[in-house]
Regions:
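Phosphate/dinucleotide-binding and metal-coordinating scaffold of catalytic cores
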Residues: 35-158
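Short glycine-/small-residue-rich flexible loop motifs, especially phosphate/cofactor-binding loops
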Residues: 5, 16, 112
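Key DNA-contacting residues within the recognition helix of helix-turn-helix
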Residues: 30-31
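Short, amphipathic alpha-helical "recognition" segments used to contact nucleic acids or chromatin
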Residues: 1-13
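Short coil turns linking two alpha-helices in DNA-binding domains
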Residues: 25-27
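Short alpha-helical "recognition helix" segments of helix-turn-helix
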Residues: 17-22
């Protein structure tokens, strides 16, 4: 439910709407969403991608961009719905392939026009996913990106 609450907030739902949906107080919603953003004590893991099918969490991907490492957790036994299928310990190359698989092809006709419409200066799968939530025509899977507030405490002087 924590991921669903964070996803609803990202989709523009108000805290009050989310609270009504889950029949909890607004304070509970605030606390749960804050919890969703505190997913790692590792200061190098600043981003988590939640790969969902509709509203069902399928895979979480904790990302360490500095050391080019990822750690995943699958939440479904349905292999086609997992971010990396049967691969239990994906590499950085697997991760970059996954990102590219959730975007339009780099070689697509009028790619520059599409990027311009998106407000992006160049083709970068991560930036595209931040704009599109990794949604693709023909499937109902998408990506929720969470930034780790816990990791920022060590670097944020405020």
């Amino acid at each position: 439910q924590i991921i669903q609450m964070a996803a609803m907030q990202q989709q523009g739902k108000s805290i009050a709407e989310i609270a009504r949906t889950f029949q909890v107080s607004r304070q509970t919603v605030y606390n749960q969403i804050a919890r969703a953003h505190c997913f790692s004590t590792d200061p190098d893991v600043k981003t988590r991608m939640c790969f969902l099918y509709r509203d069902q969490l399928c895979t979480t991907i904790d990302i360490d961009f500095r050391h080019e490492k990822i750690a995943i957790q699958n939440y479904t036994k349905k292999i086609p719905l997992r971010a990396f299928g049967v691969v239990a310990h994906p590499t950085w190359d697997d991760f970059t392939w996954f990102l590219e698989s959730r975007c339009f092809p780099k070689t697509r006709d009028h790619a520059k026009d599409i990027l311009k419409e998106m407000g992006l200066p160049f083709y970068d799968p991560l930036l595209i996913i931040e704009k599109t939530d990794g949604r693709m025509a023909g499937d109902e899977q998408w990506i929720l990106i969470l930034k780790n507030k816990e990791a920022r405490h060590g670097t944020d002087p405020s």
